[in-house]
Amino acid sequence: MLRIEIQSRNGVAILHCSGRVVFGVEVEMLRSMATSRTEACVRIDLSRVEKIDATGLGLLVELQTWAWAKRKNLTYLDPSEHVWLLIILTKLYNSLEISYSDVIQFSGEIDDCGRQELIA
C-alpha cells in the first residue's frame, strides 16, 4: 500500500509518500499524482517509503525526465535508508535530483485547503 499526502503552498507541491512504491497501483498512483501537479516545483518526500522495486526506481527516473521536459523543478527529498541503498547500488544518484534539507524549509502550518491525501 502507498499513501500520498499532498501539501501545496507558494508554487511548491510536496508529495509525502509512505509505504511501498512497487509495481502495480502504487506506481500508477504516484505517477498520476506527480504528473497532475500544476506547480512549477514538485518535491517527492521518500523518507517514509519502506519498499521500492525496479518499477518504482524506473518511475523515479521517468518522473525526473518528465520534469526536465516540462521545465519543472522536481526533487526527491530524504530517501529512506532502503531507497537510498538501491539508488546507490543502481548508480541513479547522478540522474536524480536528491535533497536532504527542503522538508525542513517547507514545513510549517498548512491550512486544510493546501492539504490532500490519497491512499492506494
Please place each PLM-identified region on the residue numbering.
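STAS-like cytosolic regulatory interaction modules
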Residues: 1-51, 61-120
